């Protein structure tokens, strides 16, 4: 009888487990798949910074308003907020210490939308430290035998089609930023190896290949010129240098009265008159 009773309990337990599993699966299946979008944030020590998050969905579903999001800094939850009708929510965070922090945003488990956690970088910088602007194209290895541009980092660092970093670029850039420079990363959204890449995809590619943490500037309709103007208007006037690959990048930085190093060397006659060139990344530090 004891064996029969034990068997009966196990059967009941299995049935209950199956019911719970089906209910959970049904609940998850009823959610609309979505995406969380968060940009890097830049501020001063002991200053408040606004972190803006967007909830996006590809198909029609539940209203985007009222979705609860959780904000974490370096893995510690610091705030929760609800989205408005546009699916946006803003968090104000007081950054105390100089350095870089990991911003993480998670969607609440009870939300009608399912989305993976997303990360960004919070840069807490002092204004006196110089900033180097780096064109992401200069970090991506080009295939000289191919007539087509290299694929963008959209596929992720573990995919065979993902861009390969230039040898020694991460190491040399880390040396530049260890004690002296802060780094702002920019890229061309419309063409080149980083075309159609989002800031999150660029950020993940940089992290996967051990490039130093920095501010990944979001592409705007005004291009690089608008990005530089926005940083200056926010008080970041110590942008003195840049490292890039293309003539367009070099021309724009020279217009902003910045020194610029192009790596590798451009074909003869294409280098702007006041720009410097380096054969490889080992030469870059000597040129700045």
Regions found by a protein language model. Name each.
Residues 29-50, 122-126:
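Beta-strand-rich domain onsets/edges
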Residues 44-63, 69, 140:
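Beta-strand-rich structural segments
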Residues 68-79:
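Short amphipathic beta-strand segments in non-cytosolic proteins
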Residues 77, 81-95:
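Glycine-centered loop-to-beta-strand initiation motif
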Residues 98-111:
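Short, aromatic- and glycine-rich surface loops/edge beta-strands on solvent-exposed regions
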Residues 112-123:
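Edge beta-strands of extracellular beta-sandwich domains
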Residues 126-219:
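Conserved, compact domain cores that house catalytic/ligand-binding motifs in diverse enzymes
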Residues 193-288:
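C-terminal cap/substrate-recognition subdomain and adjoining C-terminal extension
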